[in-house]
């Protein structure tokens, strides 16, 4: 009984990891596209600002 439960829980965890790595499509709304692009710009600009400080 315990072995079966352990096996099923392990398989469930592995399947979750496998399917959770799929890329989710961005929302079709304009707000989603704008917020996504601004987030990428913020991350890139913060990375560029840190490089000269070193």
From Swiss-Prot:
Lipid-modified sites (S-palmitoyl cysteine): 2
Membrane topology reported for the UniProt record: Lipid-anchor
Pfam families (alphabetical): Rod_cone_degen (PF15201)
Expression sites by tissue: Expressed in retina (at protein level).
Molecular function terms, GO-annotated: opsin binding
Start-end of Polar residues biased regions: 35-46
Transmembrane segments: none
GO BP, sorted A to Z: visual perception
Positions of the UniProt region annotated as Disordered: 24-54
Record keywords: Cell projection, Endoplasmic reticulum, Golgi apparatus, Lipoprotein, Membrane, Palmitate, Phosphoprotein, Sensory transduction, Vision
Subunit structure: Interacts with RHO/rhodopsin; the interaction promotes PRCD stability.
Family of this protein: Belongs to the PRCD family.
Protein name: Photoreceptor disk component PRCD
Organism name: Bos taurus
Gene: PRCD
């Amino acid at each position: 009984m315990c072995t079966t439960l352990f096996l099923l829980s392990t398989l469930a965890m592995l399947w979750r990891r496998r399917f959770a790595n799929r890329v989710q499509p961005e929302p079709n709304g304009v707000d989603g596209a704008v917020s996504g692009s601004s987030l990428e710009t913020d991350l890139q600009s913060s990375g560029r600002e840190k490089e000269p400080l070193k």
